[in-house]
């Protein structure tokens, strides 16, 4: 008798941490005999790996569940799982069960490694499960990691966050900060390099505070030194960096390590000291501007990107003007801009001075117009230069072109053969757009 094919599809929402979680769940399922499929209609298991940083992300999940309900009606044996940060919030798992009773499994951030076993139990018992445990359990090592997916890979170095910014739900759903042992991180990086990976991105909610809980003297600068020493590795990236914890030692370390890319994602969130204090960010605009100057002094040509929130409770027009002024001063290469979204359970959600959506939308529009003009001007200044690009594969918008990224994290689109995927090539930049540049490969 031929065994039934076991298939799965994971749909990921949110940040790189979620992308890495999804990779881990895929590895666990493949080790359990499942195979990934491209289309939801082909899947015996569908998993939504969720984000709850903003209300919009949660609404996308509820919308997707509505679409998947039709598949469940056509195939009652289909297992539907909702996993990740959204589920970890108090009361949300029960809310999902009420709104979407056809969901079979609700799985918290601290229980993802139990996924294959839980799916088999659900298939055998025909009974839904809610498994939402402590999000601050010990770091689990030696989970299966299948062959690398191309030349790039994410490597988690910390879990959780200790900062408790007043707008942010992450510490409540990811738990307190826990660092992985450096030897386990280096082991994983070496294994990835042996499989053909040449670029790793080190992941954490705040990579700059890596090692504080290990009590053996290791910090993020020291970890970067060790990763930089791995033979065969060509590039190191890292996200996210908290400005408060970006030490002078870290700046100088990054400046002299040849594999660390010349790009820092440095979320500022606001340009007003009053709003930064209300957010509990732990730094001032003056500190941030000094840090930017220090980075540019030590690392010529560095690109800087950031996150910005408009419409935080109590934000006045003068506060918002401070944000516009900071953006104009720093000249970010790119910025991820958002309207403030109240998150239940956070301090900011109950602050006085909640702003109307119309004001938030108007401020977001002005901020985006300013930043887009800066991004375009900075990209136009690069036209004519020759840059190193790691080819990531066919362009999503034009499959006949290749796409890749420079060391400064610029997205480059250029003609070339798909066999170059995973290779480092030289590209001369010929045209600039707001979000990307176009170019031509240089022979040899």
From Swiss-Prot:
It is found in: Cytoplasm. Its EC number is 2.8.4.3. Monomer. It is an enzyme of class 2 (transferase). Pfam families: Radical_SAM (PF04055), TRAM (PF01938), UPF0004 (PF00919). This is tRNA-2-methylthio-N(6)-dimethylallyladenosine synthase. The keyword Transferase applies. It comes from the Bacteria. The keyword Chloroplast does not apply.
């Amino acid at each position: 008798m031929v065994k039934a094919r076991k298939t799965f599809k994971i749909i990921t929402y949110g940040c790189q941490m979620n992308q890495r979680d999804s990779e881990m769940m895929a590895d666990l399922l493949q080790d359990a005999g499942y195979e990934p499929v491209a289309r939801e209609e082909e899947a015996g298991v569908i998993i939504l790996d969720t984000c709850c940083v903003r209300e919009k992300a949660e609404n996308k999940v509820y919308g997707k569940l509505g679409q998947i309900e039709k598949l469940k009606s056509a195939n009652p044996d289909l297992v539907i799982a909702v996993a990740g940060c959204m589920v970890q919030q108090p009361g949300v798992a029960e809310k999902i069960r009420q709104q979407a009773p056809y969901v079979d499994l609700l799985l918290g951030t601290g229980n993802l490694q139990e996924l294959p076993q839980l799916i088999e139990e659900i298939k055998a018992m025909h009974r839904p499960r809610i498994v939402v445990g402590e999000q601050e359990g010990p770091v689990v090592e030696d989970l299966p990691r299948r062959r690398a997916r191309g030349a790039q890979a994410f490597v988690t170095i910390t879990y959780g966050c200790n900062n408790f910014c007043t707008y942010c739900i992450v510490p409540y759903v990811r738990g307190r900060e826990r660092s992985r042992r450096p030897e386990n991180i280096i082991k994983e990086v070496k294994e990835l390099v042996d499989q053909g990976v040449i670029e790793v991105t080190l992941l954490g909610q705040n990579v700059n505070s890596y090692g504080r809980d290990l009590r053996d003297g290791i910090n993020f600068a020291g970890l970067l030194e060790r990763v930089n020493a791995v033979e065969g590795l060509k590039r190191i990236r890292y996200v996210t960096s908290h400005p408060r914890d970006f030490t002078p030692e870290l700046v100088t370390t990054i400046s002299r390590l040849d594999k660390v890319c010349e790009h820092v994602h440095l979320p500022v969130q606001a340009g007003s000291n009053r709003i930064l204090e209300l957010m509990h960010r732990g730094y001032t605009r003056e500190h941030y501007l000094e840090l930017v100057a220090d980075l540019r002094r030590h690392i010529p040509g560095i690109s800087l990107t950031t996150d910005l929130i408009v419409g935080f409770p109590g934000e006045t027009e003068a506060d918002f003007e401070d944000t516009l002024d900071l953006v104009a001063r720093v000249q970010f290469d790119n910025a991820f801009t958002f309207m403030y979204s109240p998150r239940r359970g956070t301090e900011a959600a109950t602050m006085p001075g909640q702003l109307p959506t119309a004001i938030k939308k108007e401020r977001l529009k002005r901020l985006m117009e300013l930043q887009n003009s800066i991004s375009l001007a900075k990209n136009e200044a690069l036209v004519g230069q020759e840059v190193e690009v790691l080819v990531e594969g066919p362009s999503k918008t034009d499959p006949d072109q290749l796409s890749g990224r420079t060391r400064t994290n610029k997205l480059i689109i250029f003609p070339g053969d798909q066999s170059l995927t995973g290779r480092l090539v030289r590209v001369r930049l010929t045209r600039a757009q707001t979000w990307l540049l176009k170019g031509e490969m240089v022979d040899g």
